[in-house]
C-alpha cells in the first residue's frame, strides 16, 4: 500500500512539474541584444513609427527605404533594445500598375542591431549598420481587389509618384535569415492563395519630402527618400523552453520512471 502511495505521489509530482514547466515555456527571448516576450498578448507586433522611402512611378522601378523599429510587442526601445537601435533597410520592384493599384515583387527587409545608437532619420547611412539580426524575404500572395499575385500591394491616393494621405500597403514576408529567424518561422499568416507566410506587413505613407529637399539620385542623401510612413509587421513567435524548466520536468519524469521500475522489479521478485 505504501509503495502504491509512493508511486501516486511521484506521479502527482511529475504532473505538477510538467504544468509548471509548461507555464514557463514562453519567457522573454533575447537574440542579439533584442528582447521580447513571446507570451505577450500582442505577440507578434513590430512597428516602425517613421520610415522613409524612394518614389516610384512605373513598372521595373525599384523602391528602397530605411527606418528604425519603435515598438516591439507594445514595448518601447528601452525594453526591447536597451542601448541599441534596431534599424532596417528594404527594397521592392514594381511589377504592375493598374490605376491606383501598385504591385511589387522581389522584396526583402534586412534588420540590424546597432549598438552605437546612432540612427538619425535625416541620415540614411545610419540605417542598416551594425550586426545583421533578421532577413525577411517577400512571399507571393494575393489580395482582394488586385488582379495579380505579388509580395506587396499598394493602394494609392493621389499619384503613384506622389501619394497622398490615405495611401496604404499590405504584403507578405517570410523569415529567411539572421539569428532571429528560427524564433519567427511560424507560418501563421494566410497569403490568400491557400498558403501561409511568417508575416503580414501593413503600412501607410504619403509624399512628405524633407523641407528644402529637391529629389536626389544619391541613395545616401535623405532627399532621395521623399515619402514618409509607418508600418506594422504581424506574426507569431516560437516559444522556446527555458533550460531550467525543461530540466525539472525531465527530473520529475525520471523519478516517476525509477519508482515504477522498482515497483515492477519488486513485484517480479515476490511472484
Describe each region flagged by the PLM.
Residues 2-10:
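Bacterial N-terminal signal peptides that target proteins for export
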Residues 17-24:
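C-terminal segment of classical bacterial N-terminal signal peptides
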Residues 18, 65-67, 148, 158, ...:
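Small side chains
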Residues 242-261:
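A short, hydrophobic C-terminal helix/tail in secreted or cell-surface proteins
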Residues 258-271:
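C-terminal membrane-anchoring or membrane-association module
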